Amino acid sequence: MKLHTLFFYLFLLVLCIINPVSVYAEGVAVDTLHTDSAKVKQLDEVSITAKNALKVSSTPLQELSQYRLKELNSLQVSDAVKHFSGVVVKDYGGIGGLKTVSVRSLGAAHTAVAIDGIAMGNAQNGQIDIGKFSLDNVDVISLANGQNDDIFQPARQVSAASVLNIKTVFPKFSSGIVTGKVAVKGGSFGLINPSANIAVKLHEKLALTCSGEYLFANGRYPYILEYGNAGDSTSKELRQNTDVENIRAEMALYGRDSVQNGNFKAYFFQSKRGLPGATIFYNTANFSSQRITDRDFFAQGHFERQLIPQVTIQLNAKYQYSFTHYLDPVYLGSLGKEENFYHQQEGYLNAGVLYNVLHCLSFSFNTDGIISALNADLQDFAKPVRYQWLTSISGKYVNSWLVASATALFTLVDEKVQSGNASKGYFRVNPFVSATFKPFNKINLRFRVFYKNIFRLPTFNDLYYGRVGNINLKPESTNQYNIGVTYQAYLADFLPKVMLSCDVYHNSVKDKIVAYPTKNIYTWTMLNYGKVSINGLDFSGEVAVKPHSKVMILLGASYTYNRALNVTDPNSSDYKHQIPYTPRISGSGRASLQTPWVDINYSLVWSGHRYAVNQNYAENRVEGFFDHSISASHDFIIKRHLLGINLECLNITNKNYAVVRYFPMPGRSWRATVYWKF
């Protein structure tokens, strides 16, 4: 049986289990999709999107609700994630440029990205491009260092050093059976971005949502090209090959009653874009000719049922297909171009059980199976298939002053190839422990600590890519240590919200997978060579000030100090140098003025200098930057519907700073949004 056929039947089997049970459940029904106002209020009180909800977490957990996302002048998930402390988003410029996220200098391959609690996969290079994800139908973005306190989460999330979870909007009906939102954005550099979200209540316990959007931008923004021996000469250029055209379509089905809930989501995304090249004098055109076409599809289902008050089970399933077409029309080879096609498939199944032994003590068991396959039109390509079996056993204790949890993760990996030799299998056991303490009854001051040992597997590119791949690679291992403190309070009507958190951490990485020259500078291979020692501090704070009953001022800030040093070889010239593209200091800020007449929002992202390569010399330095943006918005109520207008000015100071060396970001730009909620 072919691999894609096996994936299809496995996924179909799980859906047959999920859908009939979730829709035609027995028992006393509690209508969570109904419009009863009392029930809606009860849900809002515990909703994680509530503006003043108090968070209790034994690990650093940062969240941005849709209320906050509106204040950050963000178009994509990658724009919003820059406001989390401890995060570096490597951005190659423009809307269509590749954007990956590294947390606390561990690298993008150590960050899992999940959609509604089920992780995305990319066994080819281990990195998820978060620039592909729109904020159009996002409810909450959360980032957990280590892992969050939910011991019922799938084992796959436990297997990552950090997890970025994107939670989409759950349908809510204030009146009638149809609700939705249509919007259109437009702005500088040819941006046009219409979108629509529709939700239909099919039954008292069943709802359907459909969402879609189109995005186009030519991306032709001006920038200053510096040249000369000291960069003392400049010319004004226009960025080339930064156009992007995206199409996204989603459908989701939600069912829920008193003892169970389930959902099914199907997602399609297509992107055609240029890959902007490095801005090199006299050669800007040839370095900006590559094109890439991506098509991503996934279908996933979740089912959860309470068997008895003490026992809950869950099932999750996912099928994911990714296609990439890469074209370099000016490649200096015999064919005069380089063109490759990549097909990646993944099947995923999860089953879990949660047992509440006592009101304060619970245990969980989750087991996940993953099959990943990659095919490419490269000569003698290995066509690898990876089989993973992950099992997590977790426990959690909660009382009025203590939250403590522990997890043991068991990982079994095997690989097969159709050409050449396969990488050997692995078996690992990895621990995690965390706790948060509240020493004072009347003061919401908490101390937290966690330790996690985890690894990331070599990617298919690391193992099998041409002569560079090395099938003898070992997993890249990390140890994470964290001690922190949080404070949250309602101090007065004038100062209804104060939230502060500070964490100090130490991470160590061994067997780091790096490209290393073997015989000479032209012959490279992947090796377990690197060691990194990381020490840092993350701080974040948020304050709400209410000077008048109809006026609210929100202030927020984050700051990161990160000392990430290469400690591989004491005899090398880069020993104890800061690793590439890791600023020693960085941060963000935001301010919002909310009035009945207009809402004004200001946001800031800033970074200290970085180095483009391992050697921390002046010629390798990438300067720091400040990016200021401001917006004004107002909502009009028209016959119980809402018309909203939002105007934004991005990068006010018009600086073409670079996150990645020779890849300048756009200068000042404008964006306008009009939306209609019904």
Predicted feature residues:
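Flexible loop and strand-edge segments within Gram-negative outer membrane beta-barrel domains
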Residues: 27, 219-221, 235-249, 256-313, ...
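N-terminal periplasmic "start-of-domain" segments of outer-membrane beta-barrel proteins
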Residues: 30, 40-71
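Extracytoplasmic beta-strand/coil segments of soluble accessory domains associated
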Residues: 78-119
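A beta-strand signature from Gram-negative outer-membrane beta-barrel systems
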Residues: 135-181
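Membrane-embedded beta-barrel scaffold of Gram-negative outer-membrane proteins
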Residues: 310, 314-326, 447-450, 476-535, ...
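Gram-negative outer-membrane beta-barrel transporters
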Residues: 363-364, 401-404, 499-508, 527-612
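Surface-exposed extracellular loop regions of Gram-negative outer-membrane beta-barrel proteins
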Residues: 414-419, 423-429, 435-482, 504-527, ...
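C-terminal beta-signal and adjacent terminal beta-strands/loops
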Residues: 510-511, 553-555, 606-613, 621, ...
